[in-house]
Amino acid sequence: LVPHAVDGSRRALQKVLRLIHPQVLRYCRARIGGGRQPTAEDVAQEICLAVATSIGSYEDKGRPFMAYVYGIAFNKVTDAHRAMGRDKSTPTEEIPEDSARDATPEEWALEADGSNRMRALLDTLSDKAKNIVILRVFNGLSAEETAEIVGSTPGAVRVAQHRALAQLRKTLQAAQETAR
């Protein structure tokens, strides 16, 4: 499918974008979260646009196409974080676009609370460690694929993941002990 998109097939490109969008959005939500400007959905859209405009120059060098996509995603999320640092405005509450889901207000609140706690926990990590955990744990990439994206070796990715998960475990245990 990707080679056809690279060769200029609009239909193949549409299919590729439909396939990558959920994974890109999940990555953006884990890195950016909700209630901020730009939103995870905005950044995911920018990533898909960047993939669409650059796919013609993509060369298969033996690594998975998603490594190429996550490389673009990493850069776009980094740009969004920089923009958030410069933007001192306070956004208003956003209306969820996924209102078709049949969830009660209580379920929405619990889901948002869990996402916020996970995001706060991930924010205790360095940017590189957070990115490794998101790519390996949330997106299910291999150590090799993650290493390509973050510019490291697979061994260093495994070590960083182990240390990051240990740090998260320690932070979570400390939070649970203070809550008692």
Task: Report each predicted region and the residues it spans.
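Short, charged helix-capping/linker segments at alpha-helix termini
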Residues: 7-15, 25-46, 154, 178-180
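Pre-recognition alpha-helix immediately N-terminal to the DNA-recognition helix
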Residues: 23, 117-120, 130-131
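Arg/Lys-rich amphipathic alpha helix in sigma70-family domain 2
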Residues: 30, 53-60, 71-92, 111
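Structural recognition of an alpha-helix C-terminal capping motif at a helix-to-coil junction
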Residues: 42-49, 63-75
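Acidic, proline/glycine-rich intrinsically disordered inter-domain spacer in sigma factors
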Residues: 95-123
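DNA-recognition helix of helix-turn-helix
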Residues: 129, 144, 148-177
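A short pre-motif secondary-structure segment
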Residues: 132-136
